[in-house]
């Protein structure tokens, strides 16, 4: 995610809207991508707990979609977050 710090709250609003729309429209893979983007945003804000929470949601959705490559990528990211205290 390539955004300036001043645009983080705007990005958070757009990601939240994307999550609502993808839930409403049953776009599960896109919903997983939304949660992964949200995790990255929280990671940039320094909120590791929320980053982990959203990445875990993305992983579960990717598993439901059978997106093994994305599961693997997100699990590696989650392990990296877990190492940071």
Region spans (language model):
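Helix-coil-helix junctions within alpha-helical repeat/solenoid scaffolds
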Residues: 1-85
């Amino acid at each position: 995610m390539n955004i300036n710090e001043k645009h983080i709250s705007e990005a958070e609003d757009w990601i939240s809207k994307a999550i609502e729309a993808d839930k409403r429209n049953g776009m599960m893979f896109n919903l997983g991508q939304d949660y992964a983007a949200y995790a990255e945003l929280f990671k940039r804000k320094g909120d590791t707990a929320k980053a982990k929470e959203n990445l875990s949601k993305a992983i579960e959705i990717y598993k439901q979609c059978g997106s093994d490559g994305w599961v693997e990528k997100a699990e590696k990211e989650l392990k990296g977050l877990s190492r940071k205290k």
